[in-house]
Amino acid sequence: MQTPMTIRDHLERARLVYGDRVGIYDEPDQPASSLGDLTYGQFYDLAQGMAAGLDDLGLEQGARVGIVSQNSARLLTTLFGASAWGRVAVPINFRLGPDEVEYIVDHSGCDVLILDPELEDTLGDIKVKHRFISGEESDSLFKVGAEARPWTPDENATATINYTSGTTARPKGVEMTHRNLWSNAAIFGWHTGVNDRDVYLHTLPQFHCNGWGMPYATTAMGVPQVNLRKVDGPEILRRIETYGVTLLCGAPAVVAAILDAAAEWDGEIPGKDRVRMVVAGAPPPTRTIERVETELGWEFIQIYGLTETAPLLTINRSRQEWDDDTPAARAAKLSRQGVPAVGITMATDPEGEVLARGNHILKSYWNNPEASAEALADDWFHTGDGGVIDDAGYLTLQDRKKDVIISGGENVSSIEVEDCLFSHPAVEEVAVIGVPDEKWGETVKALVVVGGDADVSERDLIDYCREKIAHYKCPTSVEFRQELARTATGKLQKFKLRAPYWEGVEKGIN
């Protein structure tokens, strides 16, 4: 027997098994009225009520429903209320400007747009058939108690469209099917051990890969979900303490905020020997990994993936064989991107690009057949990342292919140089880029944010690197910055950091 896998399965199970359990804790500090604490039974009723409200608006199945919001119970409701009854949720990055959001709304063909109240002034003029401000206005969609129009489940139907951040071009809309999301949720849940004794904290933006798919995995297992509107280190620790949080996800920048807050925390760090933190978005330095385990007492788990892969491709979680390792030795092993998740096949092509196959890799890019064909050429998904896979199956990223620095004919991995600089106690953030050089083609430049009141010079950091890595890999110059350009999910925007140095150069390499 075979039945279609759709995300309504997760919602139906939560209602049946955990209907009386508080499943959603809404953000109390938000411009809209908080929905408070919702049981999974109430959450189901809201989601179905939203589907019924969309019926009343005349939206056909397959219609797109956009939402631009920070983390909230209403955003979670939209992910299920739109998709679980046959429509398509389009969660949009709330940090984008009006032109960018308008492009996404227009390109995806949204019939409905729900806006965070803080964004009404900047995004309120975007043309769309039905616009609602999140809160009392959008709550008019919730026809609680009404039966939504039946939908014949189709696991190959598009459930969400998630727009990837563009570099030189417009962003692409990643189509995720119900099967994609279902597979990612199940596999993510297996590997991270999601169970009904967990409490999950939404530190990830829920627009980003649908909160990496955790809303589906946690809902299916009846896990209470705590919303957090804005990342703030001290507040994260407070909520972990208040709600008994056991699981959270984030980029390395979130880890840094938590470590900074922990240094000022009075008393034992909340969640010690209980919290599992899943990190992705950039390869974290080994020093950071070690600090998570020694200073916080939390388990560090690294994953690797992309929006196009829902996102889980690989996972690196401490193994029994590593139990007797020193924290530093274990951190070094955890700094790799990990082994393929269940159902994922990985390979590299002759140029070193990482390739992948699996059930949760995108259906296609929305209305972009050329990009879809390129990304899925030869029945592999082409990640655009360069890496190596060892005999045990562990992937180690070398760099984004376009970020490899070639100096004097030698390839330099910016990740390796960044990891070296991160180990210096004065360095809080760093980005390593290649800049044009008449003699060498490119030379290595480090852009550094110094932590606190630390006093360090350009010469100090260059000499520090020369003691640790091959001289040809070391920066020839260091520039100190107050901050580094990042995406909403914490990734360094190296194309922005490189651009000023390559102005007037015909190609982006020398």
List PLM regions with ranges.
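Conserved AMP-binding/adenylate-forming core of the ANL superfamily
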Residues: 3, 23-72, 76-80, 97-102
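Conserved pre-ATP/AMP-binding loop-to-beta segment of ANL
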Residues: 4, 19-22, 146-163, 170, ...
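ANL superfamily adenylate-forming
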Residues: 27-36, 118-155, 262, 328-330
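Conserved AMP-binding A3 loop
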Residues: 37-42, 159-183
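AMP-binding/adenylate-forming catalytic domain of the ANL superfamily
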Residues: 470-491, 510
